[in-house]
Design a protein with these regions (language model features):
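Active-site metal-binding loops of divalent metal-dependent hydrolases
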Residues: 6-10, 49-52, 81-83, 122-124, ...
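Conserved beta-sheet core of the metallophosphoesterase superfamily
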Residues: 151-213
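Short, conserved loop/helix-junction motifs that constitute active-site signature segments
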Residues: 68-72, 134-135, 159-166, 236
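Conserved catalytic scaffold of divalent metal-dependent phosphoesterases
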Residues: 76, 83-161, 189
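Accessory, non-catalytic peripheral segments of nucleic-acid enzymes
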Residues: 39, 207-318
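Active-site regions of enzymes building and remodeling cell-envelope glycoconjugates
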Residues: 75, 105-107, 117-119, 137-141, ...
């Protein structure tokens, strides 16, 4: 049984994501990977690229090596586009020796690799001329390639080039639902951006006959909610939730910054056009703006104009 995961995107210090929460989630993920290996009698774990989100920091490397040292089953890691340093090069080349010396069960693959009736095409080789066509005598391929998500996301290579394989197991697209043609994506096990609702994340189990099934992880996620009051901004224990506070300018002026606040959103009911008469006073122009553009109620408009008038008189007296 082969376990296939991809797109871990180990990253610390992301905006609005507390580092302790992120570290805790990665460690929980590592444990769930081990649980899946034990439960399903997995003999090989393949990690299909974008294990890192970028060239890793020291703290991100610490998480990586914590995972590597505890690996108990044969594991193959190959690179994705986020590990690329330039075309046809990956920083995994620099991690290969230390990774394999730390735990001989873990192999880092940075060049096209063959085993029995399957092969691995790392991202560093994907864009070499003839890289796909030159892979012969295998029916199954592991790689990292962007597929299509209409209408905006287009494939990075002609996907018909993969038609020679019975199944291609690939990293890159973050949702299993983006599986297409003969290309199967496990999706990212962890949400890497904030979502409005909880999404399903998981992994692939590949049997000896190359049939596969998709299974879910149960991990905390990054969520964004829209509220109209700071009283609705409740800190959540499992998921990490941030909030957009929606209201008019007057309401939002009293909202203080906090770790739970993502942004303030001015809510407007109409797309009004401001029409000003040349005979209007500044107070009248301000009243029109507050009423028809910012859509404040009459009491708030009167209060703001009163403050403006008082300050104007003081300025004229100085």
């Amino acid at each position: 049984m082969i376990l296939f995961t991809a797109d871990w995107h180990i990253k610390l210090g992301q905006k609005n994501v507390p580092i302790p929460w992120a570290c805790s989630r990665y460690k929980l993920f590592f444990q769930q990977v081990q649980d899946a290996i034990d439960k399903h009698d997995v003999s090989l774990h393949i990690i299909g690229g974008d294990l890192f989100d970028r060239v890793p920091s020291m703290d991100e490397l610490t998480l990586y090596f914590d995972f590597v040292k505890d690996v108990s089953v044969d594991t193959i890691i190959f690179d994705g586009n986020h590990e690329a340093t330039k075309k046809n090069h990956t920083f995994f080349t620099n991690l290969k020796r230390v990774t394999e010396e730390l735990n001989p069960k873990v192999k880092v693959i940075t060049e096209t690799f063959y085993l029995h009736d399957w092969a691995i095409l790392p991202y560093a080789d994907l864009h070499r001329k003839g890289s796909i066509e030159d892979i012969d005598d295998v029916d199954y391929l592991f790689t990292h390639v962007r597929g299509e998500i209409p209408p905006h996301v287009t494939p990075e290579v002609d996907l018909e080039r993969f038609d020679k394989f019975k199944i291609v197991f690939a990293g890159d697209l973050h949702a299993h639902e983006n599986t297409q043609r003969n290309i199967v994506y496990p999706g990212s096990p962890m949400t890497t951006s904030f979502h409005r609702n909880v999404v399903k994340t998981g992994y692939l189990l590949i049997d000896d006959d190359w049939s596969w099934t998709w299974h879910e992880f149960d991990l905390p996620q990054l969520l964004r909610k829209t509220v109209t009051s700071t009283e609705e901004m409740v800190q959540t224990e499992w998921h990490h939730t941030i909030y957009e506070v929606e209201g008019d300018v007057s309401d939002l002026s009293g909202v203080k910054n906090s770790d739970l606040l993502d942004k303030k959103v001015i809510k407007r009911k109409t797309e009004a056009t401001l029409i000003l008469d040349k005979e209007m006073t500044m107070e009248e122009e301000l009243g029109e703006y507050l009423s028809y553009i910012l859509e404040l109620d009459e009491d708030k408009v009167k209060k703001i104009i009163g403050v403006f008038s008082d300050n104007s008189r003081k300025a004229n007296m100085e």
